[in-house]
Amino acid sequence: MSNQMNTMDITEILKYLPHRYPFLLIDRVLDYTPGESLHAIKNVTINEPFFQGHFPVQPVMPGVLILEAMAQATGLLAFKTMSDDVPPPGVLYYFAGIDNARFRRVVEPGDQIHFDVKMIKERRGIGVFYGEAKVDGEVVCSAEIMCARREINQ
């Protein structure tokens, strides 16, 4: 049994996710097991564009962006589950639904968010996942996320 970790740096992440600045919200994948789980990080800095308006006096990362980052992590897990190869052009995983989202504390500049997502089930291109976002080991957000595999015309 191997203890080798499967990682993804930003160069590899860019091959899987269509998101680009300012909406690419995953910096690195620390480990993943196709069909099971993925652990990714987001380094939150004061340079994030959303901090200009949310909120200038007391900067707080918007909860919807924490959920978006979690959805991007589920997309990476879905792609790695489908195949270890880079996806063909025009194949995407769309954020299709969310249930039981809960926010437990704020995320501020200087925090590093750890995303742990687990695949619950997949059927006919629809994946259901459970995810948690943590800062310093404390859960800041949790949710059940659905994503759908789609081919788009280019």
UniProtKB/Swiss-Prot annotation:
Q: What is the active site of this protein? A: H54
A Pfam match: FabA
Entries under InterPro entries matching the protein: FabA_FabZ, FabZ, HotDog_dom_sf
Compartments where located: Cytoplasm
Keyword flag Cytoplasm: yes
CDD domains according to UniProt: FabZ
Picking any one GO molecular function of the record gives:
(3R)-hydroxyacyl-[acyl-carrier-protein] dehydratase activity
Q: Which residues form a coiled coil?
A: none
Share an example GO biological-process annotation for this protein: lipid A biosynthetic process
Task: Please give the superkingdom of this protein's source.
Answer: Bacteria
Task: Report keywords, A-Z.
Answer: Cytoplasm, Lipid A biosynthesis, Lipid biosynthesis, Lipid metabolism, Lyase
Which reactions are catalysed by this chain? a (3R)-hydroxyacyl-[ACP] = a (2E)-enoyl-[ACP] + H2O
Lipid biosynthesis as a keyword of this entry, yes or no, is yes
Which protein family is it in?
Answer: Belongs to the thioester dehydratase family. FabZ subfamily.
Q: Record's NCBIfam families? A: fabZ, PRK00006.1
Please explain the role this protein plays, according to its UniProt record: Involved in unsaturated fatty acids biosynthesis. Catalyzes the dehydration of short chain beta-hydroxyacyl-ACPs and long chain saturated and unsaturated beta-hydroxyacyl-ACPs.
Protein name (Swiss-Prot/TrEMBL): 3-hydroxyacyl-[acyl-carrier-protein] dehydratase FabZ
Organism of derivation: Shewanella sp. (strain MR-4)
